[in-house]
Amino acid sequence: VVLADGKVLRTGGRTVKNVAGLDLTQLFIGSEGTLGLITSATLRLRPLPVRTATMVATFDTLEAGCRALDGIFASGVTPSVLELMDQETINAVEDHTRMDLDRTAAVLIIAQADGVDALREVDTIVTCCENAGASLAMATDDPAEGAMLMQARRLAGHAIAAIGPTIIEDVVVPRSRLGELLTAIARISAESGIRIATVGHAGDGNVHPNLYLPDLSDATRSTAIAVAEQICTATLELDGSITGEHGVGQLKMGWLAQQLDSTALAVQAAIRGALDPQGLLNPGRGY
């Protein structure tokens, strides 16, 4: 890491465990470029799984999909992948690449497990989905079929972007409250008239509502930003966070005080002030 004064800092090490001093690696990773410039990173690779199994399920209603997720979380299985797509996302993917997805489905869930118990785990997830009223639920341990099912989720971002400009949101809630968040997003979309394609990582409660912008007028942008703030407010009411992956950036700087108290903000400002007193790094962003 290159610091604001030009000094070079190396963090971390080759050991599996290391608690000598503060965890500076995580501090700089999470700083959005406000504390230093990361010029290199060393990663540890994990071996490819020797066996995978994949499942997919569709639901006619949002409520049924949420019941399935609650059942999956309660079942104790720990899939390596647990993703969801709403109807807007399903249709975007199907418009982009014909995959014979059910356009009438309100929710699509895709899960994948690996290891010796992979098929047993996805079979358990299939049962949870069937018990919740899935219109379709199937599993496979064939790698080619699994790759085809996963492709639908991987195409979601490209398919949504192909439709037109969007604001991509990034919010996360406790998994037990994910259903409430999805319901709130659907309500906000209906009330505002802004179409929202929601896709996300159900396994950790992190979703990405994509707000479609019919045009780039100031009025449309203002409406969309107000909708994004409503989603963040709903997220905080569910004990969540306004960002799970993408960071605060510029858009959410003004909303950060809704989540962090004055002490937390002051500590972060003090850290930044100590490392970059002149505000040279990523100006206009931060705390």
Listing of model-derived features with the role each one plays in the protein:
Residues 1-287:
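Noncatalytic alpha-helical scaffold of FAD-dependent oxidoreductases
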